[in-house]
């Protein structure tokens, strides 16, 4: 059964299978949950946080908390967190701070940067690069490079829909071949 409602996978945001520093890593996350989540103004479990991603970033449905898919995700997060100290947040968790510019955003300059730096992977229209059906089935994903907006991307409730979150992530991780250029 498919729970994601779009063409993204966990690795669309959590780079290198959730192990890349500043690539929204999941390594170490096991030891910081349960955790207060400001959006909900409540302490939430890791399973609840995963379902938040499923519903917003993946634009889909919540996983059954004790179902095989949730157990697999939680087991993987625990496995990649084993070397980390419980209760201690890791260096490189999230994306690094980015100073806010002292000027207004410039959409025309943004268009130029996108065309010269982003479009080669994400497409001129930002809809990503789809894989052929056989390759997609083999790799377990629909896209070589994910769409950045539209129906096969995250929804407006996702963290990446926040301009500062997206800017910090892009600045630290894009383009993939030369992070930090953008």
Predicted regions and their residues:
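Electrostatic cytochrome c docking/interface patches
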Residues: 1-2, 82-114, 128-130, 178-179
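Gly/Gly-Pro-rich "capping" loops immediately C-terminal to redox-active cysteine motifs
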Residues: 2-49, 128-175
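Solvent-exposed, acidic/flexible segments
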Residues: 3, 39-43, 63-66, 70, ...
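The canonical Cys-X-X-Cys-His
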Residues: 7-18, 73, 110-126, 182
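Second-shell loop/turn segments in exported
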Residues: 36-39, 59-63, 97-100, 153-156
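Non-transmembrane alpha-helical segments in soluble domains
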Residues: 51, 74, 78, 111, ...
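Short amphipathic alpha-helical interaction patches enriched in hydrophobic/aromatic residues
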Residues: 54-58, 152, 174, 178
């Amino acid at each position: 059964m498919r729970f994601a409602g779009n063409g993204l996978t966990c690795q669309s945001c959590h780079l290198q299978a959730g192990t890349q520093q500043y690539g929204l890593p999941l390594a170490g996350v096991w030891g910081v949950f349960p955790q207060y989540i400001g959006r909900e103004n409540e302490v939430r479990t890791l399973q609840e946080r995963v379902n938040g991603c499923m519903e917003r970033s993946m634009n889909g449905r919540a996983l059954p908390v004790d179902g095989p898919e949730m157990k697999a995700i939680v087991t993987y997060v625990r496995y990649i967190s084993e070397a980390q100290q419980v209760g201690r947040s890791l260096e490189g968790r999230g994306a690094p701070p980015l100073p806010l510019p002292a000027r207004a955003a410039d959409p025309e300059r943004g268009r130029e940067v996108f065309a010269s730096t982003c479009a080669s992977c994400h497409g001129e229209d930002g809809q990503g690069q789809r894989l052929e059906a056989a390759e997609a089935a083999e790799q377990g994903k629909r896209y070589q490079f994910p769409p950045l907006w539209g129906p096969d991307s995250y929804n407006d409730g996702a963290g990446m829909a926040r301009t500062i979150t997206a800017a910090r992530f892009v600045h630290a991780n894009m383009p993939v071949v030369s992070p930090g250029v953008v």
